[in-house]
Amino acid sequence: MVKHSFIALAEHASKLRRSIPPVKLTYKNMLRDPSVKYRAFAPPKMVKRIWPDKTIQKAPRWLSTDLRDGNQSLPDPMSVAQKKEYFHKLINIGFKEIEVSFPSASQTDFDFTRYAVENAPDDVGIQCLVQSREHLIKRTVEALTGAKRATIHTYLATSDMFREIVFNMSREEAISKAVEATKLVRKLTKDDPSQQATRWSYEFSPECFSDTPGEFAVEICEAVKKAWEPTEENPIIFNLPATVEVASPNVYADQIEYFSTHITEREKVCISTHCHNDRGCGVAATELGMLAGADRVEGCLFGNGERTGNVDLVTVAMNMYTQGVSPNLDFSDLTSISEIVHRCNKIPIPPRAPYGGELVVSAFSGSHQDAIKKGFAIQNKKQAQGETRWRIPYLPLDPKDIGRDYEAVIRVNSQSGKGGAAWVIMRSLGLDVPRPMQVDFSNTLQKNADALGRELKSEEITKLFKETYNYNNNEHIYVTLLNYEVKKLNPERRALVGQVEINDKVVNIEGYGNGPISSLVDALSNLLNVKLSVQNYSEHSLGSGSATQAASFINLSYIKDINNHATSNMWGVGVSEDTGDASIKAVFATVNNIIHSGDVLLAE
């Protein structure tokens, strides 16, 4: 029969089949051959790479540039009040280096720099960016005067494209300009006797480093280093930015390793990364850059910044965390951090953003939900035995570590399976729903989700479960047990006698079976004049200690249509401090549900 139906279906499909020609690409705007317009980036020639065999073992120095690079890229920059709130949040997260402004650009930036200087903890360094111009450098030093720790950050574009197109500057002129700026910063800071109360650090960025020939990047930084004369205790910071991401992350790692192995006095140098995300690889480039020798990472929370943004510091830090390496940053309340970033930047955090997105710890797929539910069941057992390792399918991070709860882990829509609903019921009612009942409830849920055309909320799922299975016999009460007694006839035979109330009348009942439940079901079969049979029964304890209760689940089959002997079945749930009472509640919940369905009619 099945074979013939498949054949008929195939024949029908064959008749309907029509030829669909391949789609021809029009290339309305894109080029058929992009090589006539774009050239592949030429990577540095590396005889031997060390970084591919390394792993990240410790946290880098972190610098947040949210208040400078991030803020300057906002359509509507932060207010002073928002900057202050953001500044203190960065400190509370654990950032020890914060780039707060471009103080020579405006009085507002200058004033905020003064606020940061006066309100930063002693162990937090305040950094400011400045162009390599004398009057701007002097203004920046003025803004930072009095800080416990301060870093002046100068920069100069070093790529051939920028030197030739934007600045019309030779390599020699670029080196001279960078050295001149460095000497001036030195004169006004660490060499000035009146500035000795501040620990002055210096950062130089060969801007567009990722598009700069490696040997020239080293050459200009050597000249800057010689002019600054760093120490091991206070190394010079060479920030090597992917100002525009021009190649794959492995190429950036090669560039970092080349610089790290060719710069002299490496112990007096701190190599910093500052990756933008033009190709979508900012995090990967940063991580490979650390493998290649970078000591420090600059970026923004959730990747704010010019164009496609800077590297997302949350992702880099939490990637380390989930590999067992402490990032020395505290994202325990990532939800509140996300709220502040969203509100101050006026840019929403994508719901799928790693770690911070609303949906990153949520599973809608049925197979995912089932795996997660099983993972938690095993995890709970192992934790009771002293195991601390986190090992849950599809969840590389314990949501509680970032302040999320487990309620958000499993979400139910029309695509969800039985595991998702079972998880919600376990979390809301404490019930470990038996697998056959999960399948039954899943069908009910999917129909509801399809009808609504949206995700079902946890409270909606719980309400639907209670209504569907007459939870604890609290709905649709047609038959009520008044009293009963079970007598032992022989080792395998029991008799139940009792009274029920039905249609406002007290009726005697009597039934037989191998135990109390089967005897009660037999008695109700006689009462309703329909054959009821126990198809599935399970129970488990609920809670612990003096508050322990019992939960019982029962599935009863019955003849739905006496003419063709069609059968159906229904589930019910009962909860009570007494196991026997829970079982009885489950039976009556099921029977009353059957009556409510209209499949079985009460006698007048």
UniProtKB/Swiss-Prot annotation:
It is an enzyme of class 2 (transferase). It is found in: Mitochondrion. One of its GO terms (cellular component) is mitochondrion. Its main location: mitochondrion. One of its GO terms (molecular function) is metal ion binding. A divalent metal cation binds at residues 69, 274, 276, 310. Pathway: Amino-acid biosynthesis; L-leucine biosynthesis; L-leucine from 3-methyl-2-oxobutanoate: step 1/4. Gene3D superfamilies: 3.30.160.270, Aldolase class I. Its cofactor is a divalent metal cation. InterPro entries: 2-isopropylmalate_synth_dimer (IPR013709), AIPM/Hcit_synth_CS (IPR002034), Aldolase_TIM (IPR013785), IPM_Synthase (IPR005668), LeuA-like_post-cat (IPR054692), LeuA_allosteric_dom_sf (IPR036230), LeuA_N_DRE-TIM (IPR039371), PYR_CT (IPR000891). It catalyses: 3-methyl-2-oxobutanoate + acetyl-CoA + H2O = (2S)-2-isopropylmalate + CoA + H(+). Catalyzes the condensation of the acetyl group of acetyl-CoA with 3-methyl-2-oxobutanoate (2-oxoisovalerate) to form 3-carboxy-3-hydroxy-4-methylpentanoate (2-isopropylmalate). Redundant to LEU4, responsible for about 20% of alpha-IPMS activity. Involved in leucine synthesis. Present with 28800 molecules/cell in log phase SD medium. Homodimer. This is 2-isopropylmalate synthase 2, mitochondrial. It comes from Saccharomyces cerevisiae (strain ATCC 204508 / S288c) (Baker's yeast).
